[in-house]
A protein has these predicted regions:
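Selective transmembrane helix interface/packing segments
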Residues: 1-243
Length: 243
């Protein structure tokens, strides 16, 4: 069973079963790694917030992360998005550390499950939509009416824009889920080849495994970045009503 590349994505209960009616609230391995990701973030930035005359490596990492996200928000959503810095920063870090913890052997990749990524994406979608209506009222609906479109094509374009808008949580969640699941599946497959072929024939898949691991670490960062920057783009639409 452990040789099955899909076995690593199984969700199983840790501890007693907790159910309210038909709703299962049991603590699972997915819950554990979400909690661990949050704790690692809290520990790192708690250590990084200490005021030392000479910054240590943790402080430098915290400051670099702060500057990176701050610049991303400014470049993508503008000065009006600054009040939402804490949310974007927390979102990026949570997705990043969930991805990175999944790189540890025999761990669990939370973001390889569509239910996790979709809940995050749906929360962003609903939140951005609320911000848009609070900022512009029903004028927010102008987002679906591009300027300069001939009246004859306008009904079709509006329908396309609405469908595109409603598909945002789907595309945002599937992109992260699919990349993480595909990458970890390939790593497991090549790892299985190394074990099966042994010392003599296993050097080639081992080389691929090492290269794939490095690539997957890069993908883990890029997917967190893409998730955060798309959130900034959606926020920019809500705040500035650009099309």
């Amino acid at each position: 069973m452990a040789s099955n590349p899909m076995y690593q994505f199984n969700v199983y209960r840790i501890g007693p079963e907790i159910k309210i009616g038909e709703i299962d609230l049991s603590f699972t391995n997915a819950s554990l790694f979400m909690v661990l990701s949050s704790l690692v973030i809290l520990i790192i930035f708690n250590l990084g917030s200490k005021k030392n005359i000479v910054p240590n490596k943790v402080q430098l990492l915290a400051e670099l992360s702060y500057s990176f996200i701050s610049k991303m928000i400014s470049d993508t959503a503008g000065i009006k998005a600054k009040p939402y810095f804490a949310f974007i920063f927390s979102l990026f870090m949570f997705v990043l550390f969930c991805n990175m913890l999944g790189m540890i052997p025999y761990s669990f990749t939370v973001t390889s499950h569509i239910i996790v990524t979709f809940v995050l994406a749906a929360f962003i979608f609903v939140g951005v939509t609320i911000i848009g209506f609070m900022k512009h009222g029903f004028g927010y609906l102008k987002l679906f009416v591009p300027s300069g479109v001939p009246m004859l094509l306008l009904p079709l374009i509006v329908i396309i824009e609405i469908i595109s808008y409603l598909s945002r949580p789907v595309s945002l969640s599937v992109r992260l889920f699919a990349n993480m699941m595909a990458g970890h599946t390939m790593m497991k497959v090549f790892g299985g080849f190394v074990v099966s072929l042994g010392i003599i024939g296993g050097w080639l898949p081992l080389s691929f495994s090492v290269a794939l691991t490095g690539l997957e670490i890069l993908v883990a960062f890029l997917q967190a970045y893409v998730f955060a920057i798309l959130t900034c783009i959606y926020l920019n639409d809500a705040l500035n009503l650009h099309h």
